[in-house]
Amino acid sequence: MSDRNKARVGEFLDRVLTGGDIEATGDYFAHDMVEEMPFPGQGPGLEGLKETLIRIRSGFPDSNWTVEEQVAEGDKVMTRFVWSGSHQGEFLGIPATHRPIRVWGMVIDRFAGEKIVSTRILMDTFGMMMQLGVIPPAGQQAR
């Protein structure tokens, strides 16, 4: 089951996050899934997740999510990933900068059967904000 769960996470990254098939999110997540560390403004359950993914996709329409490493134990899968793309639309209140990003992150997904029932994600948000020019690089003062 661990290998199957790892494959499901990889399929989700390819089909939904990189491919943009947001409607397919329900193929991978339970309707009442729980986001343990919700994205700012994220509503509950599957619908809240889909709304968040739409916002991410509109800010970064050329998003590419790559699995770097996965570890599975029991009903959990930990995935280390890289997210890249260019900031072409509003994201978290930040107007498009047209700058590229490359952000690392990790997510722990818990499965019940074929679907993810809880997830928690940690990304290098600080690094992303520096890449977008919102936070100045070390040694430079904010304007």
Where are these predicted regions, by residue range?
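C-terminal and inter-domain tail/linker signature
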Residues: 1-143
